[in-house]
């Protein structure tokens, strides 16, 4: 409370306020979480004199110490305490020359804290159940406490007879469906707590089977073969009378001990001795054990074997999970635990249930578990970036009683250095990281069980940076010398590695006479050859990370040009250059005109021959196709096949094709190359079976089906067939076009296999494909329905080329193309667990996948989420290495198998199943919430835009795909803010600290500042290793 003396002082100081002194900054009221820091700012101006500042707390002058101190005119409070620091703060500015004082308006400090929650019963009767969630905590002046109610593990909301009123839960007309354990959670800025002990509500079963009996009818003796309907009065609360009590000679002699305390890991048993009279041995009697009101185990006493880890009843209030530690002994009713774990703590009660009678229960027994002292998780060593503002090392311990955590530094002086402190949760905090913080630190956890410790190594590093980056492109002539600079700084000293076309260079695999690797990282190439042309990359790295820069080397061959004559004058040289240029231009024009005329003549002759051939093959039944010149000009989206072969392979058209290869028609060569590639991908439509439509995509329907195992070839088989066909084409026709096709195809395969995986990993994938040759392959089939839509056909071909060029276990395989008739089918690899988004929703409990006797899959752990993200990064890196872009990367377009293998795919169900995630922009359906700004503004898709989408995918993974990115905004708002550059992104709450910085860099507006997939893969690999420790 503010004392009278403090009020008088404040009034006196306000009365002597100098007119020349005014506050520029006044302290503001604040709400802060307990144990965090707070700062009150205060600044006043006086043009002529020096000012002195002081602070009052609740009217009393503050006694400064290490925790509460004044820096300049500002007041700093470290580790705020709610018992001492709550109240009003006033800043006093004193003019030392005149003695005039000025007092600021009071600023209120509120402390946010949260300790515990408990469920209190306010009233219970037949018409209403009233519960209250009592919370020990405060939220200050911020948002009020958020209260959530749970029945068993189900979250409650206002619906039907359930009403949520602030801290209270009201259930009107409660019935048997409202039975269960009620708990509440409270959350604010300080954290989230759940009530340790809830309230168990169990409505009394009120049904007495009174059936009218006729003289000539008898009751069925076997209860399990007859069903009776018991109805109560209409309009009554329950409408049924209570069940009769069991006979007195059926009773529980001894129940569990009222309270037992067991150490974690030790065995124990809960007693339930009962007496069963002989006349009831043939009746159906069940022995049940309940934990916290939920059914845990039960067994029939009428002759059936004991049920271990299984039950006939699998209702929503049951805890009947598979657990070999728990055994229910039928003979004496004892429930034994092979070894106690922390989750076994609770209230236990045994029951006997005679059919058509009310159950009898033992007195409840409380089982308390003394949890072993341990670290959860184990503290790990960490690299801290030099000059980082804040860095944290976590140390969390569990045990009974709650352990105390402290940190010491190894060495002679165990005290922590300056700017290093420990918060209330045991986290070691480094502020303004410097080299003195380097060393070994030990975390000590202590309670009555003893003490445990864990030592971590803290290393202060500097991220590698280019001091002299490689600059290009570099042009040089053959036989010349080229120098490519690459110098780096960092701590530890970075290593420098050069590569050419993604193949590492070293003294062992290069010509030492021509290639020199200097100590400062510079690469010098002497006597440059034509084969030295390519893309050179310099990678620098240390324990703090990796960086890479590329430079292009262009080698110009020496021609047979005219050597300049020293004796001639400048005018002669200019005249000769002009004459040569005009002569070459004239010759080029004549050549082009002649080729155009000749190509036109040859094209007309080829069309006439092809029309004659098609007429003969059709038996003369297609005169229009043969005779109509316009019809032959139009080409389909993808050329169709006849009897499994393309028309271009017919014997009669071989001469035309051969003659056309000598022409300079770029379009003709491209179309023949595409037809040749599509011919290699041909699959018979009869090989597909059990097609089930799962949705519609941008160019047609999408199905899931099965493909005959005999039609599934390994990637190595496809390569061999391709080379064989190219060789035959080359030997048979002698055309230059087929040779270029072979060379380009082999180069594409080399590029697709040069990724983060080495050749051994590709061999392992091929071996796995051979092992599965005896089974039917699950496939995804995409139909091309919009044959006349040029944009749809172009996208269909792009996806074909993308998936055909990639041979990586992180990307689905393209098995082939069915072109026998419309619609064309693209056949892709599929998995038994389907698309990744549905899997995430199932593990989050948003999709009901539980069957009878089973439960929903548990949520993914952080290690599992990191493993999924890592596999997607590897697959996208393979796409980047093959010089392709995905353009629609999301969890809905990835698939996962039961072996937890994730692959990048392309279902793109944008028309129905995932239509909510697409928006029509500029007459095109786009996944705008996953697209980079340059894609929406300029329709520019690059690998950097795929990296932007990958950051959103990781956000989806850590949110279990339960919500859309920026779901609070409409699609139009997302487009507007993305184009304006005001769309703000933040990582998911569950993201590890080591990944936050690199994931945020995926969403920067400048694409050049975004990381590469290899950098993301390295960061994820390091995070996975940390999570496993």
UniProtKB/Swiss-Prot annotation:
SUPFAM superfamilies: Immunoglobulin (SSF48726), Protein kinase-like (PK-like) (SSF56112). GO terms for biological process: cell adhesion; dendrite self-avoidance; homophilic cell adhesion via plasma membrane adhesion molecules; imaginal disc-derived female genitalia morphogenesis; imaginal disc-derived male genitalia morphogenesis; internal genitalia morphogenesis; negative regulation of canonical Wnt signaling pathway; photoreceptor cell axon guidance. Disulfide bonds join 42-91, 133-184, 272-350, 395-443, 486-538. It is a single-pass type I membrane protein. The chain crosses the membrane at residues 578-598. The keyword Transcription does not apply. It is found in: Cell membrane. InterPro entries: Ig-like_dom, Ig-like_dom_sf, Ig-like_fold, Ig_I-set, Ig_sub, Ig_sub2, Kinase-like_dom_sf, Prot_kinase_dom. The modification Phosphoserine is found at residue 674. Keywords: Cell adhesion, Cell membrane, Disulfide bond, Glycoprotein, Immunoglobulin domain, Membrane, Neurogenesis, Phosphoprotein, Receptor, Repeat, Signal, Transmembrane, Transmembrane helix. The keyword Signal applies. Residues 19-577 are extracellular. It comes from the Eukaryota. Glycans are attached at residues 35, 332, 413, 425, 440, 453, 508, 520. Residues 599-1029 are cytoplasmic. Residues 716-727 have a biased composition (Basic and acidic residues). Interacts with plexA; component of a receptor complex that mediates the repulsive signaling in response to Semaphorin ligands. Belongs to the protein kinase superfamily. Tyr protein kinase family. Insulin receptor subfamily. Acts as a calcium-dependent, homophilic cell adhesion molecule that regulates neural recognition during the development of the nervous system. Component of the repulsive Plexin signaling response to regulate motor axon guidance at the embryonic stage. Also component of a receptor complex that is required in the adult visual system to innervate the lamina layer; specific targeting of R1-R6 axons. This is Tyrosine-protein kinase-like otk. It comes from Drosophila simulans. The gene is otk.
């Amino acid at each position: 409370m503010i004392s009278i003396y403090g009020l008088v002082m404040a009034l006196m100081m306000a009365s002597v306020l100098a007119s020349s002194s005014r506050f520029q900054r006044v302290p503001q009221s604040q709400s802060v979480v307990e144990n965090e820091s707070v700062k009150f700012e205060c600044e006043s101006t006086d043009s002529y004199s020096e000012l002195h500042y002081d602070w009052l707390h609740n009217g009393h002058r503050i006694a400064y110490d290490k925790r509460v101190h004044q820096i300049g005119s500002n007041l700093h409070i470290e580790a705020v305490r709610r018992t001492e620091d709550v109240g009003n703060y006033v800043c006093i500015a004193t003019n030392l020359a005149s003695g005039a004082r000025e007092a600021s308006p009071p600023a209120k400090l509120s402390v946010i804290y949260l300790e515990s929650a408990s469920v209190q019963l306010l009233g219970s009767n037949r018409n209403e159940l009233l519960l209250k969630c009592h919370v020990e905590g405060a939220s200050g002046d911020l948002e009020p406490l958020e209260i959530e109610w749970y029945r068993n593990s189900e979250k409650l909301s206002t619906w039907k007879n359930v009403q949520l009123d602030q801290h209270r839960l009201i259930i009107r007309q409660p019935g048997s469906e409202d039975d269960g354990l009620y708990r509440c959670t409270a959350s604010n800025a300080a954290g989230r707590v759940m009530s340790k002990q809830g309230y168990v509500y169990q409505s009394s079963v009120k049904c007495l089977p009174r059936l009218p009996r006729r003289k000539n009818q008898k009751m069925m003796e076997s209860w399990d073969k007859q069903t009776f309907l018991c109805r109560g009065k209409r309009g009554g609360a329950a409408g049924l009378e209570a069940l009769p009590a069991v006979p007195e000679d059926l009773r529980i002699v001894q129940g569990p001990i009222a309270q037992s305390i067991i150490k974690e890991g030790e065995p124990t048993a809960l007693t339930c001795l009962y007496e069963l009279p002989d006349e009831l041995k043939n009746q159906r009697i069940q022995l049940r054990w309940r934990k916290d009101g939920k059914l845990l185990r039960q067994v029939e006493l009428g002759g059936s074997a004991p049920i271990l880890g299984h039950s006939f009843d699998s209702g929503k209030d049951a805890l009947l999970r598979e657990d070999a530690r728990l055994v229910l002994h039928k003979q004496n009713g004892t429930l034994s635990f092979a070894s106690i774990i922390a989750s076994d703590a609770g209230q236990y009660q045994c029951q006997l249930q005679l059919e058509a009678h009310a159950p009898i229960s033992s007195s409840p027994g409380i089982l308390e578990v003394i949890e072993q002292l341990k670290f959860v998780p184990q503290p790990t060593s960490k690299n801290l970036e030099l000059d980082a503002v804040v860095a944290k090392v976590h140390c969390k311990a569990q045990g009974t009683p709650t352990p105390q955590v402290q940190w010491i530094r190894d060495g002679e002086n165990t005290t922590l250095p300056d700017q290093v402190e420990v918060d209330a949760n045991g986290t070691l905090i480094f502020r303004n990281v410097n080299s003195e913080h380097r060393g070994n630190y030990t975390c000590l956890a202590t309670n009555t069980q003893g003490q445990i410790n864990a030592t971590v190594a803290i290393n202060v590093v500097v991220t590698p940076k280019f001091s002299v980056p490689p600059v290009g492109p570099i042009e040089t002539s053959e036989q010349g010398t080229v120098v490519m600079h690459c110098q780096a700084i960092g701590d530890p000293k970075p290593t420098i590695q050069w590569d050419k076309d993604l193949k590492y260079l070293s003294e062992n695999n290069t010509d030492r006479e021509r290639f020199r690797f200097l100590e400062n990282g510079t690469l010098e190439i002497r006597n440059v050859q034509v084969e030295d042309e390519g893309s050179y990359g310099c990678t620098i790295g240390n324990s703090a990370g990796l960086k890479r820069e590329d430079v292009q080397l262009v080698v110009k061959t020496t021609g047979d040009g005219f050597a300049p004559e020293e004796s001639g004058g400048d005018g002669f040289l200019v005249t000769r250059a002009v004459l040569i240029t005009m002569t070459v231009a004239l010759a080029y024009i004549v050549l082009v005109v002649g080729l155009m005329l000749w190509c036109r003549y040859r094209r007309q002759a080829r069309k006439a021959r092809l029309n004659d051939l098609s007429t003969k093959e059709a038996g003369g039944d297609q005169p229009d196709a043969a005779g109509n010149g316009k019809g032959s000009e139009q080409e389909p989206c993808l050329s169709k096949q006849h009897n499994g072969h393309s028309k271009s392979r017919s014997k009669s058209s071989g001469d035309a094709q051969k003659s056309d290869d000598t022409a300079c028609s770029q379009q003709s060569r491209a179309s023949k190359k595409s037809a040749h590639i599509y011919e290699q991908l041909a699959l018979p439509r009869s090989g597909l079976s059990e097609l089930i439509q799962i949705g519609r995509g941008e160019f047609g329907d999408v199905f899931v089906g099965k493909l005959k195992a005999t039609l599934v070839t390994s990637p190595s088989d496809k390569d061999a067939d391709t080379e064989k066909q190219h060789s035959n084409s080359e030997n048979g026709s002698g055309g230059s076009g087929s040779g270029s096709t072979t060379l380009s195809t082999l180069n594409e395969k080399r590029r697709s296999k040069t990724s983060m995986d080495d050749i051994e990993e590709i061999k392992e994938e091929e071996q796995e494909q051979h092992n599965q040759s005896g089974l039917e392959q699950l496939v995804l089939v995409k139909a091309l329905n919009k044959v006349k839509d040029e944009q749809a056909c172009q996208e269909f071909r792009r996806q074909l080329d993308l998936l055909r060029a990639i041979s990586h276990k992180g990307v689905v395989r393209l098995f082939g193309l069915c072109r026998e008739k419309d619609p064309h089918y693209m056949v892709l690899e599929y998995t038994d667990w389907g698309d990744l988004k549905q899997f995430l929703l199932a593990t989050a409990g948003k999709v009901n996948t539980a069957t009878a006797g089973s439960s929903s899959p548990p949520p993914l752990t952080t290690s599992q989420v990191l493993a999924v993200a890592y596999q997607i990064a590897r697959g996208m890196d393979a796409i980047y290495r093959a010089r392709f872009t995905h353009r629609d990367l999301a969890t809905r377009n990835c698939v996962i198998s039961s072996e937890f293998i994730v692959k990048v795919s392309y279902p793109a169900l944008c028309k129905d199943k995932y239509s909510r995630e697409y928006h029509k922009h500029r007459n095109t359906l786009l996944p705008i919430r996953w697209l980079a700004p340059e894609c929406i503004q300029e329709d520019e898709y690059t690998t950097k835009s795929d990296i932007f989408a990958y950051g959103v995918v990781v956000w989806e993974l850590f949110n279990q795909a339960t919500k859309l990115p920026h779901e609070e905004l409409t699609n139009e708002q997302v487009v507007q803010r993305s184009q304006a550059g005001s769309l703000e992104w933040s990582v998911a709450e569950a993201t590890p600290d080591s990944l936050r910085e690199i994931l945020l860099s995926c969403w920067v507006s400048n694409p050049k500042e975004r990381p590469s997939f290899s950098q993301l893969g390295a960061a994820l690999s390091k995070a996975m290793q940390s999570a496993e420790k």
